[in-house]
Regions:
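Hydrophobic residues in beta-strands of the RecA-like P-loop NTPase core, especially within AAA+ ATPase
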Residues: 44, 135, 149-150, 166
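Short acidic capping loops at alpha-helix termini that bridge into adjacent secondary structure
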Residues: 96, 159, 178-179
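Conserved catalytic/switch belt of AAA+ P-loop NTPases
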Residues: 122, 147-164
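Short regulatory helix/loop adjacent to the ATP-binding pocket of P-loop NTPases
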Residues: 144-155, 170-179
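Short glycine/proline-centered loop/turn elements that form peptide/ligand docking sites
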Residues: 164, 168-170
Length: 180
């Protein structure tokens, strides 16, 4: 029997508590992470609204809630809304996480944002040595931002992870694509 959905509420990716359709990818990422073989830079490509950012937020939540109470449920692909890592990601207050995105839809991501990210990377964290950067709408990086990001990607440390999300493959510099 098909379940009828009475009302569907569309939430921003970081507010989505359940992950649908990415189970195999998620489990593959978890295996790589547990074996310390997860790449430092991951490029998530696809059409807008396909779940790339939701996937990234779920995996970031998994990493940041690792070994803590109220941790991420791999079996159900769900975020515990009581989890400190979820609450701090939701409020953008997690000291191990930085979000890089354009301020206004359709505007370029300026080099100042990349410099802010660099400052974040140079600060120490209080709870772990992991740093996670989510770059959303990466196709809006201008040439200066892209080149600054490229330098950061080349010099990234072992426990620093970049999730680069974009909707238009052709607008990403080949040199950035080659680092992912």
């Amino acid at each position: 029997m098909i379940k009828k959905i009475e009302s569907l509420e569309i939430l921003p990716p970081k507010n989505q508590l359940e992950l649908f359709g990415y189970e195999n990818y998620f489990n593959s990422f978890v295996k790589l992470y547990k074996k310390n073989k997860l790449p430092n830079t991951m490029l998530l490509s696809g059409p807008k609204g396909s779940g790339k950012a939701t996937f990234a937020y779920h995996f970031i939540n998994y990493i940041l809630s690792d070994k803590k109470i109220n941790k991420y449920s791999i079996e159900n692909m769900t975020i515990n809304p009581q989890s400190l890592s979820y609450k701090s990601l939701l409020n953008n207050t997690n000291p191990n996480f930085s979000l890089l995105e354009n301020d206004t839809v359709g505007e370029n991501i300026k080099i100042d944002k990349v410099r802010d990210m660099l400052n974040f990377l140079n600060k120490s964290t209080y709870s772990s040595d992991i740093k996670i950067i989510l770059i959303d709408n990466a196709e809006y990086l201008n040439i200066y931002s892209s080149n600054a990001l490229l330098k950061v990607l080349e010099e990234s440390k072992n426990k620093t992870f970049f999730f680069i999300i974009h909707n238009s493959h052709s607008k990403i510099l080949d040199t950035i694509r080659s680092r992912c």
